[in-house]
């Protein structure tokens, strides 16, 4: 049964936001290498896309812009990057980026998210890496997908990652422990199935909301987008 309510969503979002504010430096230090799956993404994009003189990229939940660094190494195109996130500390050394400081989750829940992107043009490439699992509530995740579809040039590409950490016994065990701790502190949380809290290193109070996606749930996203987009590739990596 799906039980997520706005009070729970707000609490989870606040915990995740606090996590990234407090742990930005140590978290970024562990996120310096490209994801293995990005190489396969490039293969899906193809040589024609990567050989263009200019590419526009909308990156939702951009983090440290690792993907753009990786993309720049594999194309000669000039990148026009529109980066959206709520943790500007990650971007202190980044330049030539149109940055939008935005609480994505809150605006998805109050239905204002698309309006914050009005100044962003249609892009050749729209991506959300490491974001979808931080969004509580299925309707909010679908709203993110809809916005990505609406902000992507027809015939171009959308890249999305869905974390499935319940397949990893070590992470699954950590999630169970951290979630039990969170529920002791916040007994009113109404979590959906496969909703978890995860901790971080030695930060006992640092908790972030993470959803572990099932294959069936990912199928739902594919089906939802089927009348507006064609699935090019789907794979497990990292």
Predicted stretch roles:
Residues 2-55, 63-115, 139, 157-238:
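Class I (Rossmann-like) S-adenosyl-L-methionine-dependent methyltransferase catalytic domain
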Residues 54, 122-123:
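Local beta-strand N-terminus motif with an aromatic residue
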Residues 60:
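Conserved beta-strand/loop positions that form the S-adenosyl-L-methionine
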Residues 116-120:
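Nucleotide-sugar donor-binding and catalytic loop/hinge architecture
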Residues 127:
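A conserved beta-strand element that flanks and buttresses the S-adenosyl-L-methionine
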Residues 130-134:
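Short catalytic micro-motifs in class I SAM-dependent methyltransferases
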Residues 135-147:
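A short, conserved alpha-helix within the catalytic core of class I
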Residues 147-154:
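Conserved helix-to-beta-strand junction in the class I
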């Amino acid at each position: 049964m799906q039980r997520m309510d706005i009070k729970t969503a707000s609490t989870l979002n606040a915990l995740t936001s606090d996590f990234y504010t407090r742990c930005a430096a140590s978290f970024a230090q562990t996120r310096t290498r490209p994801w293995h799956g990005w190489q396969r993404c490039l293969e899906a994009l193809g040589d024609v896309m990567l050989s263009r003189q200019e590419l526009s990229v909308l990156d939702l939940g951009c983090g440290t812009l690792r993907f753009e660094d990786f993309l720049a190494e594999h194309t000669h195109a000039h990148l026009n990057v529109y980066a959206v996130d709520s943790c500007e500390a990650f971007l202190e050394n980044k330049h030539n980026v149109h940055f939008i400081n935005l609480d994505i989750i809150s605006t998805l829940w109050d239905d204002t998210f698309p309006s914050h992107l009005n100044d962003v043009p249609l892009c050749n490439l729209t991506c959300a890496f490491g974001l979808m699992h931080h969004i509580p509530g299925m309707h909010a995740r679908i709203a993110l997908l809809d916005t990505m579809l609406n902000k992507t040039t027809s015939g171009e590409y959308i890249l999305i990652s869905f974390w499935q950490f319940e397949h990893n016994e070590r992470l699954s065990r950590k999630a169970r422990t951290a979630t039990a701790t969170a529920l002791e502190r916040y007994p009113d949380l109404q979590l959906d199935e496969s909703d978890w809290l995860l901790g971080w290193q030695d930060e006992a109070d640092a908790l972030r909301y993470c959803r572990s996606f099932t294959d069936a749930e990912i199928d739902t996203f594919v089906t939802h987008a089927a009348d507006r987009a064609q699935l090019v590739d789907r794979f497990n990596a990292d």
